[in-house]
Amino acid sequence: MNPKILVVLPFSANDGVMAEHLCDFIYLANRRVQEGHCLLVVAGDVHDEMREKVRVAAQVAFEGVDVITAPKKVDPNKNVHVNHLFRVAAEHIAASYRTPFLWLEPDCVPLKYGWLDKLAEAHFDQPKRYSGPLKRTLNAEAIVFLNRVAIYPPDCIKELAAPLGTQGQFNLVAGPVVAPKATKTTLIQEVAFADESTIVSPSAVLLHADKQGTIMNQLRDKFEQAAKKK
């Protein structure tokens, strides 16, 4: 039996449609076979209709789906909202699950068939608590930190509670604590600061920050053909 990781998909009113499209694309990338378990983390500003659309799309894509709703948060700082959703998810996971989880944001794109199994296998084949892209800040401090889209242990709230309470990006604030406990992987590619001509890494199975849907659209025909041939 292949090792499994929980897929955690957070979304707010601003990216609910993107989350729905991601679930549709995951089903296509998996050759129209339900795979894995998903936890939807719904922000308090999402209306019922959008929540239901994403839930239905997730139920098509995954073998099992759980849904939790975060209390509404009013703050102009985007980091605070992301930190809030992650805290709600991490606290719930610590109490309800025993498996590592992939924090999968709505602007992610699976790049290859079997992407989730490959991520799980690589994670369980390394000795550390976390795995994902490791980055370095560009300032003089050059802090090494784990990319937000990464695989986390189910009890990560123990290490992330304090960073999640700050105004900054929790993963950057937690860098000095988390980075030494993380294994760098090339399976997840981060393109948040790249242009649309970004070349997809041959080793990557998941890409983050396809905000315009450019890469997803490029891959759609390829996955459509593969799904028909299965």
Language-model features and meaning:
Residues 14-22, 75-86, 112:
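Phosphate/oxyanion-binding active-site loops and adjacent basic polyanion-contact surfaces
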Residues 110-113, 125-230:
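Catalytic core and acceptor-binding pocket of nucleotide-sugar-dependent glycosyltransferases
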Residues 11-18, 46-49, 107-111, 156-159:
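Short acidic, S/G/P-rich loop/turn micro-motifs used as interaction or catalytic elements
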Residues 24-36, 61:
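Short, acidic, metal-binding catalytic loop of nucleotide-sugar glycosyltransferases
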Residues 106-122:
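Acidic donor-binding/catalytic loop of UDP-sugar-dependent glycosyltransferases
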Residues 97-109:
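Short beta-strand-to-loop acidic/aromatic patch adjacent to the donor-nucleotide binding site
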Residues 42-98:
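Active-site-proximal specificity loops/subdomain of glycosyltransferases
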Residues 1-27:
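N-proximal low-complexity "stem/linker" segments adjacent to membrane-targeting elements
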